[in-house]
Amino acid sequence: MMRGPKTKSSQSGSTLVEFAIGASVFLLSMFCVIEFSRALWTHNALADAARRGARYAVNQPASNPPGVATTGLNVGPSLTAVRNVAVYGDPAGGTTPMVNNLTPANVNVQYTGFGVGQGTVAVSITNYQFQFVVPIVGTTISMPDYNTTLTGESAGVIP
């Protein structure tokens, strides 16, 4: 006995199943693109924070008496202000960091040879953990260190 063509009632569930599969693939792809975009934005913002801190630090003296070399990691009277500029965008500090979960403890400032001629300032952002909103890949990833080194400016002061 020959069967006739399939009726519409026997195919009614297939459209719903196809839509569910297609929508889940589309939504998964969309969330992956959003998370990857957030990670790239955070990468760029952290590099910019290191540059912002270094630009501020080169104009701040690392040693009070002229002619005394100041070299070392996390030294200088302007350390807190440099960290605040990198994190909050303001030397006085703030309550909301420019990048989520960035703290002043993530910012290292190194003065080299300040006080005698031209020194350099290196500002680095280390140990930053990027947190995903939707934990598709995982919950956090470690971002690389962001380093910026600039030559100090005399700002018209002769040591």
Q: Which residues are covered by each model-predicted region?
A:
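N-terminal leader/signal peptides at the extreme start of proteins
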Residues: 1-12
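A broad detector of short, well-ordered amphipathic alpha-helices
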Residues: 11, 18, 35, 47-51, ...
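Alpha-helical hydrophobic helix detector
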Residues: 15-34
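A cross-family signal for key residues in well-ordered alpha-helices
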Residues: 23, 38, 47
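Alpha-helix C-capping/helix-to-loop hinge sites
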Residues: 33-36, 60
